[in-house]
UniProtKB/Swiss-Prot annotation:
Keywords: Activator, AIDS, Cell cycle, Host G2/M cell cycle arrest by virus, Host nucleus, Host-virus interaction, Modulation of host cell cycle by virus, Phosphoprotein, Transcription, Transcription regulation, Viral penetration into host nucleus, Virion, Virus entry into host cell. Its main location: virion. This is Protein Vpr. Interacts with human UNG. One of its GO terms (cellular component) is virion component. It comes from the Viruses.
Length: 105
């Protein structure tokens, strides 16, 4: 079993990032790109501001935003999003995620 290489701080004097930070940042970029295809940008900005106010500019905040966006996308697509399967016509899910409100059939 080999040891993990020692991590050194950047030469330009910026602080060292936590392990996995590159993965978190790349994942956040990908999920934000997908979320923009399905949700109103104003809603996503409000969500980002809310999480930023709670966590600041930290990896924990980025992880929290990833968790929330994953859940929102899952529920949205499960409920029958038109864009969830390209090339297929929309059909009702056998078990919709949320019941239809009264008077909106």
């Amino acid at each position: 079993m080999t040891e993990a290489p020692t991590e050194f701080p950047p030469e330009d004097g910026t602080p060292r990032r936590e392990l996995g930070s590159t993965w978190v940042i790349e994942t956040l970029k990908e999920i934000k790109e997908e979320a923009l295809k399905h949700f109103d940008p104003c809603l996503l900005i409000a969500l980002g501001n809310y999480i930023y106010n709670r966590h600041g500019d930290t990896l924990e905040g980025a992880r929290e935003l990833i968790r929330v966006l994953q859940r929102a996308l899952f529920v949205h697509i499960r409920a029958g999003c038109d864009r969830s399967r390209k090339g297929q016509t929309r059909r009702r899910a056998p078990c919709p995620a949320a019941p239809t409100p009264r008077g909106m059939h």
